[in-house]
Amino acid sequence: RAPNRRVQMIQRLEDTLTLNGRTIPLSSQDFEDRARRADGRAYQAAFTFRDYPQWTYQVQGAEVVKRAALMPGENAVALIYEINNRGRSEAVLRVTPHLRFVPKGEALLPGQQFTLEGKRISSNGRTLYFQTNGQAVPLPQALRGPFQFAQDAMDGKPAAGWAAVNHCIELSVPPGESRTLEAVYATAHTLPGAAEAFSRLEAQNRALERRAGFTDGAARALVRAAGQFLSRRESTGGHTILAGFPFFEDWGRDTMIALPGCLLAAGRCQEAKSVLETFLAYEQDGLVPNLFPEGGEE
């Protein structure tokens, strides 16, 4: 149940660009076998972030601009890739999701199977839907890994892991032309368009900025960033703050520390009231919870 019953559906996106018969990684990933390391940073020309992250890659006369956005209030991620092929040969962009479908922090199950039916992926009792204007190409199910997570290992989390693949999305761009690849992955059957996800996120952020009333650019950026930590608690139907996201849950202490800066300073008094009501719903002996009971746990 939201927000603490988290499931990792897609671990990462393996982005590649094929030019002149050579496949070049745009994404980056360490492997236990260092010779297999994918280092797309070598081709990254720029990175910007306002309402959403945007990466720019330049490879042998081709430019790829990637944008990603989370749909507000939905379990949906939208992707837009703009490819400008100034080269003399066809460019093929390939996006391969690395799938897991397991609770956060857990490994793939032994023999875990992923079923692809049209644009629906099922595994481990869970389903993910997608839509794209590119070509969805089924692949024989295969494992990717073992990946190396050096920074996670420093925190005592697993230092290595695996993921599965069973499809990719492709878009071919002839020389001298520009094309756009769009894709949306979501847990709901009714999928928004990629452009809708971006426009809703932008509209939400403009509304937050107007409510806060700040004119300073840094202050407006903090208002946008603070809004990303507000979540809805399914057990109470009210708001809560994931102050330590993505690592921690909505701990009472951290939520109360974050509430003045994330909500009151941003002019979000009704949301602040909802957060307090969420915690007061579990008040006991004059104390509010530091952790919420989930699934029958105390």
Residue positions per predicted region:
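Acidic, mature catalytic/reactive cores of soluble proteins
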Residues: 1-298
